[in-house]
Amino acid sequence: MAADTTTLTTDCLFARTRVQVCDALRSVVPGLPEEVVQRVDLTPTRDPSHGDMATNAAMLAAKPARRKPAEIAAELVDKLFALPEVAKAEAAGPGFVNLTLKPEVLQGVAVSILKAGDQYGRSTMGQGTRVNVEYVSANPTGPMHVGHCRGAVVGDALANLLEAAGNTVTREYYINDAGTQVVALTWATYWRYLQVIGTEISADDFSPLTPNGLQYQGEYLIPVAQSIADKHGRALANADGGPADPSVWFETVRREALTQMMAAIREDLEALGISHEVFASEAETLASGRVDAAIAKLDSKGLLYEGVLEPPKGKMPEDWEARPQTLFRSTEFGDDQDRALRKSDGTNTYFANDIGYHAQKAENADVLIDVLGADHGGYVSRMRAAISALTDGKTGFEVVMCQIVRVVKNGEPVRMSKRAGTFVTLRDLLDEVGRDAVRFTMLTRKADAQMEFDLDAVVAQTRDNPVFYVQYAHARCRSVLRSAETMFGADTVTPEALCSADLSNLSSDVELAVLRRLAAFPRSVEAAATAREPHRIATYCIDLASDFHALWNRGREDTTLRFLHENDRATSLAKLALVSAIAGTLRCALTILGVVPVEEMR
């Protein structure tokens, strides 16, 4: 369904024109249900010869009005052509109506942008809607790696995007600090602790002492172990330096390891420009009784029963047995099978624990969005069923899937990090190319599409590198404005001063094309927020940068298109208003992506 663009900022040309289209439709089709009118969309045309924008209004109204779309479109054309802002209206295809606006209407977009400043593109679409976005939630068992990086950037940009669309957003990180992986981390840290205090014990010798083998052998645990040794000396080992009974050391090492690993993760996130408002602990959630409360609530609704699940599809696990378990009737809420909440031994399943955590989030949110790796596909329907059951359908649950990232340099996969032992760390990536390049590149493709992160391409100063291309456009804009300050005085080129420029000088096809692009930004924000696709904003940045560079290049051949005319102040100010509007829109878009626009290229 089309977004209700009446909620867009009042400076949005698409919002104002859509209101006029809806009024015309009501006039042409009296008594049309309002829910049909609210679905009317107004989209930028891809081909300028088809006008500036197109609407589906006639096609939406055809069925309820029991009339042909072309007939309604013809009447809409007459109504819309009579509007003072419209230069041309024509029916097209099966019932579209294309609109061409008068140049002064497009020229006014620059003024709207200058007046809106950093608020350009923001709307009230999501006003009153509380959205919880959970992202990263990396296990605190090692450094953040490139896989975490994509989810972190996508989640953070999505949160920014939803805020720009008017939602109240909570950014949350779930600390998986209870379970077998934390146990494995604790044992691995203790092994490094023994080595730090001088005990000669290899991984092969220590591994048999652990519950499930020595799973984490990266060098990143050595500083953690050293910190523990500095604080506790040899007190956590036997007199001869050998392994002590876990009752002596386990809880101390677990606590220290978790604290330091989370501190390292927070530092990595800060370096990536990410800040969460909430860090929720799995251990605290389990201790709070929320899991049992959620299970009890489902039981009170008659949604639990004792039963035996069908055997897993595909290869049968050797240890699988048909055992009675407490099952949740998730199929009643769209899942493909009922799900186990309690095992035959009375312990909760991981899914049950996760339900308790999501129920906790749902207490303060209208929509829950989890940003997860692509291997969590089977998770969506079961959790959506649980949230729907617990909240009587009042809280929505969505998942944004992030595909894997392959890092290459010189055409070859990047060597694994020695520090991490098994993967390319986030710090490796940031040290190599910088925060803004990492963030923008991670957002150049849809989250569920696989990505190759080419370290050479990301730092190349060519038009084929979208990071450079977009930043260069902003830097060029700022360079023009600085030159204008020297030529005409700083007071002359402020946004306030440029608002009074005679914009009729912006009349060339290439200038009007840029203005069309600028006019579409608020709509792009809402469309991206509705689709939960922040990569659309990166695409918008690339398209706007392309339009600007095309205008710059045309100015080399056609002097009338140049931005500065020392002997023609009026024309210069009009061009500068456009340049300032481009820079401002790029800044607003990059802010959503969490990227800092550069003032000059170095």
Swiss-Prot record:
GO annotations of cellular component type: cytoplasm
GO biological process assignments: arginyl-tRNA aminoacylation
Keyword line: Aminoacyl-tRNA synthetase, ATP-binding, Cytoplasm, Ligase, Nucleotide-binding, Protein biosynthesis
Record-linked InterPro entries: aa-tRNA-synth_I_CS, Arg-tRNA-ligase, Arg-tRNA-synth_N, Arg-tRNA-synth_N_sf, ArgRS_core, DALR_anticod-bd, Rossmann-like_a/b/a_fold, tRNAsynth_Ia_anticodon-bd
Source species, domain of life: Bacteria
Predominant cellular place of this UniProt entry's protein: cytoplasm
Positions of short motif 'HIGH' region: 138-148
The reaction(s) this protein catalyses: tRNA(Arg) + L-arginine + ATP = L-arginyl-tRNA(Arg) + AMP + diphosphate
GO molecular function: arginine-tRNA ligase activity; ATP binding
Similarity annotation: Belongs to the class-I aminoacyl-tRNA synthetase family.
Subunit structure: Monomer.
Protein name: Arginine--tRNA ligase
Species of provenance: Gluconobacter oxydans (strain 621H)
Lineage, highest ranks first: Bacteria, Pseudomonadati, Pseudomonadota, Alphaproteobacteria, Acetobacterales
